[in-house]
């Protein structure tokens, strides 16, 4: 494999560049990187790529038995399609569940007061459980009859 990498460099010669980092460029803090990761996770799980390509409506409408148009947030019976609000709501739940796990992890740090540890555990469990059960409710709205036992 080394010999294959060596073949192009028998003909090409790498330039001798002396690059230095610009003075205004600094290493971002850990919380800045974490915030960028959470925001990108929110956008990707929300289906931002799908929303840009397909351009679905933000909410849909359904005609009830009296002939009136009712707004609906979930595109029922379609696994491969979504409204924008549906994607954002689901993405919020996934992000809330992920943050709940991170909060649960932070409750294990040493030297944390007992009340703060209890509050972190409570908030973490609430975030994880609420996100899990709301995702199940969303699945029932998306696919009626699914997960019914």
Swiss-Prot record:
<keyword id="KW-1133">Transmembrane helix</keyword>
<comment type="pathway">
    <text>Protein modification; protein glycosylation.</text>
</comment>
<dbReference type="InterPro" id="IPR042416">
    <property type="entry name" value="OSTC"/>
</dbReference>
<feature type="topological domain" description="Extracellular">
    <location>
        <begin position="139"/>
        <end position="149"/>
    </location>
</feature>
<dbReference type="GO" id="GO:0006486">
    <property type="term" value="P:protein glycosylation"/>
</dbReference>
<feature type="transmembrane region" description="Helical">
    <location>
        <begin position="33"/>
        <end position="53"/>
    </location>
</feature>
<dbReference type="InterPro" id="IPR021149">
    <property type="entry name" value="OligosaccharylTrfase_OST3/OST6"/>
</dbReference>
<keyword id="KW-0472">Membrane</keyword>
<protein>
    <recommendedName>
        <fullName>Oligosaccharyltransferase complex subunit ostc-A</fullName>
    </recommendedName>
</protein>
<comment type="similarity">
    <text>Belongs to the OSTC family.</text>
</comment>
<feature type="topological domain" description="Cytoplasmic">
    <location>
        <begin position="1"/>
        <end position="32"/>
    </location>
</feature>
<dbReference type="GO" id="GO:0008250">
    <property type="term" value="C:oligosaccharyltransferase complex"/>
</dbReference>
<feature type="topological domain" description="Cytoplasmic">
    <location>
        <begin position="105"/>
        <end position="117"/>
    </location>
</feature>
<feature type="topological domain" description="Extracellular">
    <location>
        <begin position="54"/>
        <end position="83"/>
    </location>
</feature>
<feature type="transmembrane region" description="Helical">
    <location>
        <begin position="118"/>
        <end position="138"/>
    </location>
</feature>
<feature type="transmembrane region" description="Helical">
    <location>
        <begin position="84"/>
        <end position="104"/>
    </location>
</feature>
<keyword id="KW-0812">Transmembrane</keyword>
<comment type="function">
    <text>Specific component of the STT3A-containing form of the oligosaccharyl transferase (OST) complex that catalyzes the initial transfer of a defined glycan (Glc(3)Man(9)GlcNAc(2) in eukaryotes) from the lipid carrier dolichol-pyrophosphate to an asparagine residue within an Asn-X-Ser/Thr consensus motif in nascent polypeptide chains, the first step in protein N-glycosylation. N-glycosylation occurs cotranslationally and the complex associates with the Sec61 complex at the channel-forming translocon complex that mediates protein translocation across the endoplasmic reticulum (ER).</text>
</comment>
<dbReference type="Pfam" id="PF04756">
    <property type="entry name" value="OST3_OST6"/>
</dbReference>
<comment type="subunit">
    <text>Specific component of the STT3A-containing form of the oligosaccharyltransferase (OST) complex.</text>
</comment>
């Amino acid at each position: 494999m080394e010999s294959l990498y060596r073949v192009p460099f028998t003909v090409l010669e790498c330039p001798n560049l002396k690059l230095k980092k610009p003075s205004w460029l600094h290493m971002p803090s850990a919380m800045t990187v974490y915030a960028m990761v959470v925001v990108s996770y929110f956008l990707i799980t929300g289906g931002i790529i799908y929303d840009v390509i397909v351009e679905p409506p933000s909410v849909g409408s359904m005609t009830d038995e009296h002939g009136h148009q009712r707004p609906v947030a979930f595109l029922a019976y379609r696994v491969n399609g979504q409204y924008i609000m549906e994607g954002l709501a689901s993405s919020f739940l996934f992000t809330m569940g992920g943050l709940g796990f991170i909060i649960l992890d932070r409750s294990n740090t040493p030297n944390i007061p007992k009340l703060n540890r209890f509050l972190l555990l409570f908030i973490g469990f609430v975030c994880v459980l609420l996100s899990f059960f709301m995702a199940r409710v969303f699945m029932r709205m998306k696919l009626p009859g699914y997960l019914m036992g």
